[in-house]
Every structure is written in C-alpha cells, then in structure tokens.
Amino acid sequence: MRLSTSTNLYNFDRSVPYQLSMEDAMRVCRDAGYSFLDANFCGMSRLGKKEAPMTLDDWDERVRSWKVLADRTGINFRQAHAFFSVKGSITADALPDGEFGEEMMRRSVLAAEVLGVEWMVVHPVNILTDGHNDPEASFRYNLEYYGKWAEFFHAHHVGMAIENMLCGGRHNNVWADIDRLCALVDAIGRD
C-alpha cells in the first residue's frame, strides 16, 4: 500500500494559511516517511499570501526546482490539486477567478506535467440563477468549461480527476450529489 498526503497538510493553518514554502513542505513530509505527495498548486496560487510561487514570473523555475528536490529525496508526485476559485458560486457568463484563474489553471497543468503527476484534481463550480445554485446550469457550465480543459490536460499527459465538494454554507453545493458528479465525469469522457 502507498500512503500519500498533500503538501498543503503541513502548510495549512487556518489562521495563517500558506506561510511555508513548497520546499519546506516536501522536506517535512519526506522526513515523516511520505514518499508519495499530492502537489497542492491551489495553495501555491493564492495572491497576497506569503507563499504564492505559482503567481510569480519565475513560477516555472520554481516548479523545476521542486522536481529536482523530489528526485533527490525520493518523492513521487502521483497526484495534484489544480488551482480552483474559493470565491463561491458564479454566474454563467463568468470564469472562476477570471483571467487570473485561467492562467493559474494553465500553470497548474504545466507544473503537473513537469512533476510527473498522473492525476490532478479539479473542483466543479456552482452557477447561480436568480441568486440560487442551479444544478442544470451548473452541469452545462462545467461540461463546457472542463471539457475545454480536458483537452489541455490530455495534451500535457495529466489525467483530470473531478472531485466532489461538501455541502454547506450559504448555498448548497450541487456537486455534493454523487450521481450528478458521476454524470459530469461520464459526459466529459476523459481519463
């Protein structure tokens, strides 16, 4: 059995998130006995945080340095988490976090390719209609949105794993419904 943890496990303190570098997270996780890690690009893509290397001009150099460190220390990145918006539901005419979000998603895929990631998690978004999450509109939006990204993932040899979301907060998350999530995965049709 292979046990894995995420690089943000070590890096996440809700009162002061993303204060520690990816390099430190890798070293501490390796010292704790983990050789398989989930590269959390989402956590490394948050503007205004102390550690947000995916937002920097030299992001690709940082990623290559993570690969060198991983190879030197015996770490394997079999999975990752792509950038995703934490701002909540959007309208059907919007992009999750706009052009910034699109660039962070692109960088996540390219970084995953460099690190040898086999599967990268993405999170579907909820679409608001008349101030409420709309399951049908959300399905259509995510089918088009992640269908587009599936081509880019595939071109860079990274599998896309669409992960469910918890239900809670101001609006119920339509992606907490496992049947809806499975239907989306089947409709996109990529592995």
Over which residues does each language-model region extend?
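N-terminal pre-domain/capping segments
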Residues: 1-118, 136-137, 147, 153-154, ...
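Active-site groove signature of glycoside hydrolases
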Residues: 112-134, 156-168
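Distinct, well-ordered alpha-helical segments
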Residues: 18, 133, 139, 166, ...
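Hydrophobic, well-ordered secondary-structure segments
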Residues: 139-146, 150, 159-160, 164-166, ...
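Charge-rich, low-complexity amphipathic helices
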Residues: 50-52, 91-93, 127, 133-135, ...
